[in-house]
Amino acid sequence: ATPNFSYTAHDGSSGTLKDFRGKQNLLLVLFSWPESRVRLDQLRTASTAITTTGTAILAVPMTDLPPDELTSIAQGMPFPVITQGGREISRSYALFRRTLSIPDLFGEGTRQSHMEFLFDRFGYLRARWIPHGDGPSWTDMSLLTQQITQLNQEREILPPPGDHVH
């Protein structure tokens, strides 16, 4: 099971990862600033197309940003930008940059500046995109929405995952 997390966002929303289970898919966007500026603009533009597929978007800064800079980034974003809990979320999900056969895909100790994770409506992590290693695939929004549409056609085969406990 993937690590659950709590968050508070710039728009006043708050919750946990588990809140999305049984309701909608989630595109979790871990970003660095200003490195992810272009991608965040793409997501801002495509947010209506993504959310109409039953998918929420949460943007998570991978480092602690000054409050005024975070406010500037979040201004005009049609989806929540996490203001509290980002560093912990980022640290936990950075572990998913690896595979079993290659523990550090991009070199030992390398941390990526941008990663995206797609969770299905049942709470399972279904896809990961790291632009540096996976190429430009999800920059094509029609491909991303097509993959989400395919997820939406799947029926539940397992109950929601349990809590992730260490």
Segments and roles (model prediction):
Residues A1-S6, R21-G22:
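N-proximal helix/coil linker or "cap" segments that precede and/or mark the start of modular domains
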